[in-house]
Amino acid sequence: MAKKTNSNCLVLVTGVPGSGKTLVGLQLVYTLDKLDEEINGVFLSGNGPLVEVLKHALGKESKSFVQPVHNFLKEYGGNVNSIPHENIWVYDEAQRAWDSDQVLAKRGHGNSEPDDIVKIGDRINSWSVIVALIGEGQSIHVGEEVGLPLWANAIEKSGKDWRIFCPEKLESDFSEFN
């Protein structure tokens, strides 16, 4: 839909730990890559050991579609002249995205990670889809405490219209955007 309508979409997928969110995200990126050469996706994770295991298990192909989220954001988040070739970003454990204080401490600028990802989507001249995989009750480190409201805040600050797709239990957080 996003490609056909040239629109930006945020898709929120929720579930308890172990419910298969990560697998769904990986399958989405992998399948889309095989189906359509014009659709490029990337699986982003802040879990370094998971990224390494996936890269090892998937071999050469993984380098193009599995990346550490912090490396991706170092390259594209703070650099307004750099635009990724992917239009679909699957962010695993998106409730653990860093707030602006943590990003400032780690990368030297004051946007939250959701701000950076949404701004990347805003810079793309065509369409983009962010799939945020949300683990319930899993914001566990400094800079991750705010959680889901960071995503609503980033969409609110965006200069573009974003379509939001989410479970009913999250609709009230994003109702003003649809």
Question: Where does each model-flagged region fall?
Answer:
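Generic hydrophobic alpha-helical membrane-segment signal
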Residues: L35, V80-N81
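N-terminal pre-P-loop "Q-motif" helix
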Residues: M1-C9
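Conserved helicase motor core of SF1/SF2 NTP-dependent helicases
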Residues: A2-K3, T14-S19, L23-V24, L28-E52, ...
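A short acidic, Gly/Pro-enriched loop at the edge of an enzyme's catalytic core
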Residues: I83-E86
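Short glycine-rich substrate-engagement loop in P-loop NTPases that contacts/grips substrate
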Residues: H56-V80
